[in-house]
């Protein structure tokens, strides 16, 4: 049943307007990051690492939470129309399978987005910043860590989009979560807030490894928040009545 749900969710993406955002927002983020890097070369002297911080800081703080929030709201949009929710709750599909299917599809989109962001990073580094060689091997590792941290954000946004019928409100809350995440991280409590995990994983605000000596805690926090969001979704869906 889960496989059928995933196929159904994938069909929603065919000719979807969210693909325009998929391309536009990473390009905007890369443009801003590259411009900021080129304007501060006297300060940002660590080559590929410095460019990485400029590319990923605003991406992880603003653009990615907004994109994931939009993906999640779009996938829940059909269920919130008319009486579709009641029909779905009365269907033989296990409610958590529906949530898990949406999670799988948004995770796929996030993986594609991360790949596109890294391709833009390399392109801008070579073409505009004229950096020598190729990016250090640690940067793809940061990207993978960021994807692990992003899973908690994806699950959180799916819960918000599930319980809030408004399309715009979950997106606003996603942006708010990303903004608060950077401040919480700056105070040293990033592992306690799901929206900080991707920023920490991607090492988006410093050249030195922000997770040095804390990989275990980072993995635990990612798993904890992911499990918490799935448990919350299960409890809400168990009531078979999610309202705005």
Name every feature range the model reports, one short phrase each.
Residues 1-7, 76-89, 147-170:
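Cytoplasmic juxtamembrane interface segments
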Residues 1-26, 242:
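Aromatic- and glycine-rich beta-strand/loop motifs that create alpha-glucan
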Residues 17-18, 82, 94-96, 100, ...:
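Membrane-helix interface segments
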Residues 21-26, 164-182:
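Pore- or pathway-lining transmembrane helices of multi-pass membrane proteins that form conduits
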Residues 26-68, 100-164, 204-209, 213-220:
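Secretory targeting signals
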Residues 35-52, 171-244:
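Terminal transmembrane helical anchor/hairpin motif
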Residues 75-107:
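Helix-loop-helix units of permease transmembrane domains in multi-pass membrane transporters
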